[in-house]
Amino acid sequence: MSSRPPASLPARGPRLLLLSLLLLGTVPGPRPGSAFYLPGLAPVNFCTEEKKSNECKAEIELFVNRLDSVESVLPYEYTAFDFCQASEGKRPSENLGQVLFGERIEPSPYKFTFNKEETCKLVCTKTYHTEKAEDKQKLDFLKKSMLLNYQHHWIVDNMPVTWCYEVEDNQKFCNPGFPIGCYITDKGHAKDACVISSEFHERDTFYIFNHVDIKIQYHVVETGSMGARLVAAKLEPKSFRHTHIDKPDCSGPAMDISNKASGEIKIAYTYSISFEEEKNIRWASRWDYILESMPHTHIQWFSIMNSLVIVLFLSGMVAMIMLRTLHKDIARYNQMDSTEDAQEEFGWKLVHGDIFRPPRKGMLLSVFLGSGTQILIMTFVTLFFACLGFLSPANRGALMTCAVVLWVLLGTPAGYVAARFYKSFGGEKWKTNVLLTSFLCPGIVFADFFIMNLILWGEGSSAAIPFGTLVAILALWFCISVPLTFIGAYFGFKKNAIEHPVRTNQIPRQIPEQSFYTKPLPGIIMGGILPFGCIFIQLFFILNSIWSHQMYYMFGFLFLVFIILVITCSEATILLCYFHLCAEDYHWQWRSFLTSGFTAVYFLVYAIHYFFSKLQITGTASTILYFGYTMIMVLIFFLFTGTIGFFACFWFVTKIYSVVKVD
């Protein structure tokens, strides 16, 4: 029976949202995995049973992770299915990031000995009597999982066990997962993995992959400690209706389960394992064969070039304004000595007496700036560590753990920035300000997250955060982040208000009638287009890693895009700010925040488009979860980009009004 899927089988991998390569030295190239073990994940040596010692193990443990599907947002633990279960074994401890991502790694009943090959070894047999309600429920859950194409995720020596097959253009794709089984519809259409064999042909029938051929490749250690190191673990899923279940021989027809089957159904789970020495692959680069099979590296470079063109265009525009227009304006303004000349002032200098007038809703703006600063620093530091290889796919859950810990510890700059600007806006309710900074934005995110978690609890999904973890998150928030925010706010309020280069008039200047293009809404809508143009290709891969369970590892690209996004948001906001000041509209504070923050609205529109055009998600719960988590990402992105725009515009306005002579 052939086990190679044709090109029509979708290329899918596990969700490893580990958004790690050195920015310059290891931007993805011919060997994208070479930087993964730089921080020092220690290798494990394996020996045969006769040579085992404390430094060299003989037993190879296979762990199982949660099962997931691209047609459902709901992952499930391995134990939720009626598969063969481990009789003993210690469950690996999981970090905060793994728990938040829904990973549930458990020991499996599959036990191997290094270099000891086995053929058609029986693991267990499951028997179902369809007239029994409990058995029927288990069988129906198994059928539903095959219908939704749920995938196993197995782990050997911290490496995913991969299913490698050819996709389009004879390219090999190594999927770090394999399906439970597949389904032939009542019209004879083969769904998902059922296309791999002509033996899967019975209508309205499920075929379960109850046998796996596992091949483990190893590299012999030439120097130092004796033994070998595992460099790859691959498998081929197969289906057999074993003639003699007690002594299976892994031959015969496929294991089919008719949708209308009744009576007794027996499923025997078996495996075969072989070992192969691999001289060309070193342990430090053992992820390469998986990562090199991932497509779209050339598209990533196109994305970078596209973004750089936008940055160069904006930089040219800003340079022209700063070096020519502003330089001439400032020179002309500074040469005006007579009252008659002063009366002929026009453009942005006319509003010098109102440019630093406190904005409306200054409390809310300062709170947004504090939270945005927290997110901005967190993102930069997280991506920096990712580029150094600390947050690679081999270090499971590290990315999310790092982000959460950084967010908690960055309460101080959030409180400081919020307090500093609120005081500069003339605010006096410092207690309200620090409380809102501590609880408003984090509270919205947590409330959304908690509602999503209730849905996951109700569905029995492994992605549901345990009660103890929720308590731990609340403890981090209330016991560490909030006090740090108060400390930052204390120092922010203690300092003098920000000194502006020009005084503010007592009577506000009337803003003249604005043209369509200088009105607030058109400018805000236009301001988000260019920043979004820099990230939308990268956004596709990030959404794929989250919702389509594809591996993301190109942190070098992502860090470059992050820098480009910061520059683009800054320059686009400065450009529009200048045009509005020339139109004598001095309400720049909220406008600068919303101009770059509007990029998040384009993010939301793209996420909606992605849901309907790219995903195969079905079910009300999965749809609610998708848009619930999307709203969290949109809010975080809004605060992140809006803060960049405000700081850029604040610097620009302070700079230009500090170099003109004002009586």
UniProtKB/Swiss-Prot annotation:
Keyword Transmembrane helix part of the UniProt annotation: yes
Keywords linked to the UniProt accession: Cytoplasm, Cytoskeleton, Endosome, Golgi apparatus, Membrane, Signal, Transmembrane, Transmembrane helix
TM region positions: 301-321, 375-395, 399-419, 438-458, 467-487, 523-543, 555-575, 592-612, 632-652
GO CC term, one of those recorded: Golgi apparatus
Record's bilayer topology term: Multi-pass membrane protein
Disulphide bond pairs: none
Gene Ontology terms: biological process: ceramide metabolic process; glycosphingolipid biosynthetic process; protein localization to membrane; regulation of heparan sulfate proteoglycan biosynthetic process
Pfam families attached to this UniProt entry: EMP70 (PF02990)
Annotated localization: Endosome membrane; Golgi outpost; Cytoplasm, Cytoskeleton, Microtubule organizing center
Signal peptide (UniProt feature, chain positions): 1-28
InterPro entries: EMP70
Lumenal side: 29-300, 396-398, 459-466, 544-554, 613-631
Keyword Signal attached: yes
Main location: membrane
Cytoplasmic side: 322-374, 420-437, 488-522, 576-591, 653-663
Protein family: Belongs to the nonaspanin (TM9SF) (TC 9.A.2) family.
Its job: In the intracellular compartments, may function as a channel or small molecule transporter.
Protein name, as recorded: Transmembrane 9 superfamily member 2
Organism for this UniProt entry: Rattus norvegicus
